[in-house]
């Protein structure tokens, strides 16, 4: 299955180049889809996949961005830094989805500020795009989607970190959008985006 997914990515690199997209991106694999696999093993598989993908990206002049998700193989700022350091590719970048860094144990603003500090100081200059969505947690820790206003995500702290990065601008992509909420989403997002 991993080889098939790598083959899909490899087949799309020339397409990205032809379109002038310049960057492709992917989350890493959800641990629930890898029963019996440890996080270390999942990260090793990710590194093997990137070892096949990144040389093709470098050859074609296309960036490839990975996205941290707290319940995936690459699940923490430490894991992102390990991947970036291990691969050491000039074409490897990061998609920053603030919500995906926040698990139930890190939902407090203080915990999130510690995450944003790590992201900014360790690899903030590698961020190539921002994903923006709302989420929160049930008392038992179950994740659920919310409006942006009802989210537990510390957007203020996240965007404060981004404003200190060297990028002149970053695309901000609204995920899980509800068309009827477009106007309120846009107003909410404009409070933070730069």
Segments from the language model and where they lie:
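Active-site acidic/histidine proton-transfer and metal-coordination neighborhood
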Residues: 1-94
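Histidine-acidic metal/acid-base catalytic patches
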Residues: 22, 77-194
């Amino acid at each position: 299955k991993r080889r098939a997914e790598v083959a899909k990515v490899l087949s799309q690199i020339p397409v990205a180049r032809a379109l002038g997209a310049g960057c492709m991106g992917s989350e890493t694999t959800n641990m629930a889809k890898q029963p019996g696999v440890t996080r270390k093993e999942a990260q090793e598989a990710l590194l093997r996949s990137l070892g096949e993908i990144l040389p093709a990206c470098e050859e074609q002049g296309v960036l490839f961005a990975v996205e941290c998700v707290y319940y995936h193989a690459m699940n923490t700022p430490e894991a992102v830094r390990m991947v970036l350091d291990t691969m050491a590719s000039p074409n490897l970048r990061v998609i920053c989805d603030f919500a995906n860094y926040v698990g139930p144990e890190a939902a407090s603003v203080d915990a999130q500020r510690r995450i944003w500090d790590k992201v900014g100081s360790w690899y903030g200059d590698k961020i190539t795009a921002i994903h923006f969505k709302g989420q929160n947690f049930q008392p038992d820790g179950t994740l659920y989607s919310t409006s942006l206003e009802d989210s537990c995500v510390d957007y203020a702290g996240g965007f404060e970190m981004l404003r200190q990065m060297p990028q002149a601008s970053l695309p901000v992509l609204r995920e899980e959008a509800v068309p009827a909420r477009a106007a309120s989403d846009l107003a909410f997002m404009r409070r933070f985006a730069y």
